[in-house]
Amino acid sequence: MSQATASEITDEGVIESVSGPVVTAVDLDARMNDVVYVGEEGLMGEVIEIEGNLTTIQVYEETSDVAPGEPVENTGEPLSVDLGPGMMDSIYDGVQRPLDVLEEKMGAFLDRGVDAPGIDLEKTWEFNPEVSEGDEVSPGDVVGIVPETESIDHKVLVPPDYEGGEVTAVESGNFTVDETVVELDSGEEIQMRQEWPVREPRPTVEKETPTTPLVSGQRVLDGLFPIAKGGTAAIPGPFGSGKTVTQHQLAKWADADIVVYVGCGERGNEMTEVIEDFPELEDPKTGKPLMSRTCLIANTSNMPVAARESCVYTGITIAEYYRDMGYDVALMADSTSRWAEAMREISSRLEEMPGEEGYPAYLAARLSEFYERAGKFQNMNGSEGSISVIGAVSPPGGDFSEPVTQNTLRIVKCFWALDADLAERRHFPSINWNESYSLYKEQLDPWWRENVHEEFPEVRQWAVDVLDEEDELQEIVQLVGKDALPEDQQLTLEVARYIREAWLQQNAFHDVDTYCEPEKTYQMLTAIQHFNDEAFEALDAGVPVEEIIDVDAVPQLNRMNTQEDYEEYIEELKGDLTDQLRELY
């Protein structure tokens, strides 16, 4: 966050009243969304309403001890983030203050009114130019490359709001982010650092239809409810159903180039877990530490409410910057409900007319404004990049009919409904296969056919049909018991049980099972389908269900998930199933 210096202060006003994070000031010459510094301590705030001589400000810090009569200083600039090398492997708060830098200055408990630039202004980076003198460049073009971390090459771009022109001077070597590395004949100078307002989407040429899946390594997601690179997904669920673990799994194993993890109003311990785990884990694609492709934005539940509102925008702006370089970015927002609650609190302080359940009337507009910044895009420099947004939703009491869940459902195309009953039964990830859906299936099917197996969509549909049939039979089973069913339906229930227990269940804390590649996901499902086909043949030949499920090879289906050398194991298992079941008749 760029710090306002004395020369940047354009006007001063006076505080008239303070109500929690909302402060009103008089005699302040300001525009909407200007950043202001409030009170003697210079607390950062943002103008959210102007009425006559009264300016309303939401303050991004605790406002206790702020009194009427204290000054308010206007910077005349909108809330912006610093974009440049150094953002990977870093942790920020909701307004892009680097928490690790501030901790070194003042320990674990931060004082109010402190600030630090989002990017280290003194560190030097190796700049390798990609343009020469005399080259024509336009907004969005790559002018140089900086090795930012072991796994990420940071591309220095012509800022989107520049005119562009002919390169008149270009430097090579080590520079700080504020030193000029390229000069243009238009008089414009390009540094490695640029600023961008968080509420304004960065421009692109066009939005494209996503056709590649974001492979997560979670069988239930990749197999049944896939999300595309550039897609949007919501993970609603009651407390303790596994939202955060699912988000962590996606942040760890999703095949995105960059991960931006926004902890928005959730527990601090969960962010601590991310900070401790990620540096030790390897990226399956590069073998480098996961942290080297991750940017964390921590705005935990005990941090000021107003900053929750900005942290989501800070995260998506950083994601857009890396998308402009041609990277596939995954953004996790945990949890959008806390963001909506922050909006509700600010709205009620402003005495606005409440909408449903006290949320502001513009809740749907704000949610869609955020999710619509996701997508697969053609960038201004001709490259393609994507942002996939996965938002957790925490409906009180697990009630999916509340406004945040319902408005999110209208916007996203992928719905992963977490179920408290499944979580209580220790079925994880506890994604309810009857309530969840993905609208990306059809547009991703060609990719699965080409890259995994041409019959993948058909095998998946078979699994869905079996699970649907099980759901219909469960009502009868609860009334009369399983033994009263015809034998073919009893066998269907057994097959469905293996789909649930051997395929859908996955252990996030097992070294092998935590990540399941698409090929293994398919092979495991075909093994269960093979058991289904052979078992029904045995049943048709007059073999009782009890004998079929007592065959030694059948329980081996539950061990497929933990096999590293899975191809050999599954091939052998299919052979054993065939031999042992055919011996029965």
Curated annotation (Swiss-Prot):
Short name of any one Pfam family annotated for the protein: ATP-synt_ab
Gene Ontology biological-process entries: proton motive force-driven plasma membrane ATP synthesis
Keywords: ATP synthesis, ATP-binding, Cell membrane, Hydrogen ion transport, Ion transport, Membrane, Nucleotide-binding, Translocase, Transport
Protein name (record): A-type ATP synthase subunit A
Domain of life: Archaea
SUPFAM superfamilies: C-terminal domain of alpha and beta subunits of F1 ATP synthase, N-terminal domain of alpha and beta subunits of F1 ATP synthase, P-loop containing nucleoside triphosphate hydrolases
E.C. code: 7.1.2.2
Family annotation (PANTHER family): H(+)-TRANSPORTING TWO-SECTOR ATPASE, V-TYPE PROTON ATPASE CATALYTIC SUBUNIT A
Organism of derivation: Natronomonas pharaonis (strain ATCC 35678 / DSM 2160 / CIP 103997 / JCM 8858 / NBRC 14720 / NCIMB 2260 / Gabara) (Halobacterium pharaonis)
Gene3D superfamilies hit by this protein: 2.40.30.20, 2.40.50.100, Bovine Mitochondrial F1-atpase, Atp Synthase Beta Chain, Chain D, domain 3 (1.10.1140.10), P-loop containing nucleotide triphosphate hydrolases (3.40.50.300)
Subcellular location: Cell membrane
InterPro entries per UniProt: ATP-synt_VA_C, ATP-synth_a_Xtn, ATP_synth_asu-like_sf, ATP_synth_asu_arc, ATPase_a/bsu_AS, ATPase_F1/V1/A1_a/bsu_N, ATPase_F1/V1/A1_a/bsu_N_sf, ATPase_F1/V1/A1_a/bsu_nucl-bd
